[in-house]
């Protein structure tokens, strides 16, 4: 317009007027450029979540148009500042359907469904986006029936509306309704297919998810990378290894291999199929800078019990400046727990603190478990206290950790705090508390708790694990008849673990007859239970019935049943050192250390407890067999290779025997160091000649 006017003035040589028009044109152009610059600046601030800076620039705009108001409202709701968004919405001089939709969607995102309904009712004109936002809001509020009503009231439905309804059904486990609706959809896009495939897999119908993917390919739907992440996960869950390989080939063909979540899904797929080497090959295809890919490989190593490799991946992430996320810490700390390596765990804890994740429930829970499993329950409690929003998993983790370490009183104090804060306990909470009663000999407290859990305010149906704990409590306290009667009265069918708890108590209290009955019940459930054979053999050996021991060993050999070999390990400077019972010392220094300790212990009056050597041989042979139990080898190695005065932490795969328990108590006094031993039952903290279990384990 301005250029035409200037041309006309030049044509008639009206130079002065053309100068005026040029000035007006320049000022108008300057205002437009300034407005555009401010709009770009506002968008940049909103993108970086600098909402207050965006508002400052917004306030400098003379007459913001509707779209700029809408952008600010969206920015507020994405930052969970709903009140500010509503105030700005009220200030708008003019509103269009987009601004109404943005405000309604913001209320839904912020969880204020009442305000969303109020705005929806006040809308002068509704679009399909308005209806879809309300359907999503109903699903977010758990109002499935209301979502259905709104969906069927919609005057016009687009593909996004259908997709929202299908996704909502799948979210609430209404898979058949979702499938029915999916088939009725007039026009399915790739999002529709992806939603249905992922939903089927997440609802444990992975086979159907794979069939649907095949249909999608037959329909020649132009795919994005998103469906492939779901399909690969479904292949792992189905399991469908060969189809997974075919999908891998298709991913390469379509050029999706190097996309972050596709690579991560492939790594996870091969790891779940126990092909961790193939996971590594996928990872090594290129240099990855995405945390999801690194985390997938770390988790894969952890899943396949290659914990040292998992920790090596964590180190690699830090070297390559890849910042770990919550999932990374969960998998990495799980590997620390499995190895019992406190040094690695503390290093990860330090990284979590630097990233501000120590108080995050997901990371905090993993830290609590790691410290508990690594023998440091005090630090576990410290971490638990710092968790900002404690979930039921947080409470259960610390209660179970206290139980493992024989801190029964602590467990019940924490349970009391949990009840006072109106946190509802679940079945795992009661399993942890009953376990604490078992380890600490709290017979009456265990009885009351067992009764309370099924009849108190927080009613919990007793599960098999609760009965197992209660049988263990009674058995350890010598109430074998009562334990047997409890099994007979169980409302659920007793499994092998319940009978093993009774059989273990029979071994502890040398009750041969009841032990034979418990073993017979186990053999009816599992004729090849090596644990039952070993416990029954121990009962016979303690009673001096060597002929019965021989018969059992012949039967085990005939049926191909192998006794689990005893092993213990220590982790020093990030490396696991494992020892097996009966090993000759790995080096002369271990042999010398063991002999030195044997002489010192004999000076203190130590005499071997031959009942722990369950073989019909001479006493000298029994002493040698006992002296080279795996935990003693591991302790000697730890004493040699750690700093004088520091604690030695040893992990063992079998329950510690009575003689080893006595020996380790004495060693802790001789060397003046704390020795922490974790067996499958609990933790033992040996210090100054005593054990934290009080000789009750």
UniProtKB/Swiss-Prot annotation:
Residues 603-697 are annotated as: Type DYW motif. Residues 574-602 are annotated as: Type E(+) motif. It is found in: Mitochondrion. One of its GO terms (biological process) is RNA modification. GO terms for cellular component: mitochondrion. The keyword Mitochondrion applies. Belongs to the PPR family. PCMP-H subfamily. This is Pentatricopeptide repeat-containing protein At5g46460, mitochondrial. It comes from Arabidopsis thaliana (Mouse-ear cress).
């Amino acid at each position: 317009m301005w250029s035409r006017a200037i041309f006309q003035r030049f044509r008639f040589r009206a130079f002065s007027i053309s100068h005026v028009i040029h000035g007006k044109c320049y000022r108008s152009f300057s205002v437009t450029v300034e407005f555009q610059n401010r709009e770009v600046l506002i968008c940049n601030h909103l993108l970086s979540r600098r909402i207050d800076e965006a508002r400052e620039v917004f306030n400098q705009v003379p007459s913001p148009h509707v779209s700029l108001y809408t952008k600010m409202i969206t920015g507020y709701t994405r930052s969970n500042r709903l009140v500010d968004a509503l105030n700005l919405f009220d200030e708008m001089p003019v509103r269009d359907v987009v601004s109404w939709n943005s405000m309604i969607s913001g209320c839904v995102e912020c969880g204020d469904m009442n305000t969303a309904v109020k705005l929806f009712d006040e809308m002068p004109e509704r679009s399909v986006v308005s209806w879809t936002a309300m359907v999503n809001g109903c699903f977010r509020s758990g109002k499935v029936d209301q979502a259905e009503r709104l969906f069927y009231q919609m005057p016009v439905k687009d593909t996004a509306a259908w997709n929202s309804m299908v996704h909502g059904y799948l979210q609430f486990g209404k898979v058949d309704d979702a499938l029915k609706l999916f088939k009725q959809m007039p026009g399915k896009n790739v999002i529709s297919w992806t939603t249905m495939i992922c939903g089927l897999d997440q609802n444990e119908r992975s086979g159907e998810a794979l069939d649907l993917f095949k249909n999608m390919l037959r329909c020649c739907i132009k795919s994005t990378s998103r469906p492939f992440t779901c399909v690969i996960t479904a292949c792992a869950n189905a399991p469908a290894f060969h189809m997974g390989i075919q999908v891998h080939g298709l991913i390469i063909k379509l050029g999706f291999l190097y996309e972050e979540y596709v690579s991560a899904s492939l790594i996870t797929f091969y790891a779940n199929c126990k092909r961790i080497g193939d996971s590594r090959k996928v990872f090594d295809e290129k240099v990855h800078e995405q945390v999801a890919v690194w985390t997938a490989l770390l988790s894969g190593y952890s899943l396949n019990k290659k914990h040292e490799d998992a920790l090596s991946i964590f180190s690699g992430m830090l070297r390559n400046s890849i910042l770990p996320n919550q999932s990374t810490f969960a998998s990495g700390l799980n590997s620390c727990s499995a190895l019992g390596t406190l040094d690695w765990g503390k290093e990860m804890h330090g990284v979590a603190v630097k990233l501000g994740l120590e108080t995050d429930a997901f990371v905090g829970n993993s830290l609590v478990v790691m410290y508990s499993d690594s023998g440091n329950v005090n630090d576990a409690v410290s971490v638990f206290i710092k968790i900002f929003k404690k979930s039921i998993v947080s409470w259960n983790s610390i209660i179970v950790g206290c139980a493992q370490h024989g801190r029964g009183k602590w467990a019940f104090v924490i349970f009391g705090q949990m009840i006072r804060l109106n946190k509802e306990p679940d079945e795992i909470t009661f399993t942890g508390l009953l376990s604490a009663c078992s380890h600490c000999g709290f017979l009456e407290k265990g009885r009351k708790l067992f009764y309370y859990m099924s009849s108190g305010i927080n009613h919990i149906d007793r599960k098999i694990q609760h009965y197992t704990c209660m049988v263990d409590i009674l058995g350890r306290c010598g109430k074998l008849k009562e334990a047997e009667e409890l099994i007979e009265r169980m409302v659920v069918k007793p499994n092998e673990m319940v009978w093993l708890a009774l059989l273990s108590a029979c071994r502890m209290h040398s009750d041969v007859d009841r032990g034979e009955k418990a073993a017979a019940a186990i053999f009816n459930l599992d004729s090849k239970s090596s644990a039952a054979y070993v416990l029954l053999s121990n009962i016979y050996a303690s009673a001096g019935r060597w002929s019965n021991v021989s018969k059992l060993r012949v039967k085990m050999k005939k049926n191909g049943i192998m006794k689990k070999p005893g092993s213990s390990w220590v982790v020093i400077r990030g490396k696991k050192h494992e020892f097996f019972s009966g090993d000759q010392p790995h080096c002369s220094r271990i042999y010398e250390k063991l002999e030195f300790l044997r002489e010192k212990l004999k000076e203190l009056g130590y005499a071997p407890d031959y009942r722990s050597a369950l073989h019909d041989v001479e006493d000298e042979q029994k002493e040698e067999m006992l002296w080279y139990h795996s935990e003693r080898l591991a302790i000697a190695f730890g004493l040699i290779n750690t700093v004088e005065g520091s604690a030695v932490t040893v992990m063992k795969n079998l329950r510690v025997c009575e003689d080893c328990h006595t020996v380790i108590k004495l060693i802790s006094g001789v060397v003046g160091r704390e020795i922490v031993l974790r067996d499958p039952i609990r933790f033992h903290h040996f210090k100054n000649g005593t054990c934290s279990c009080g000789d009750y384990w």
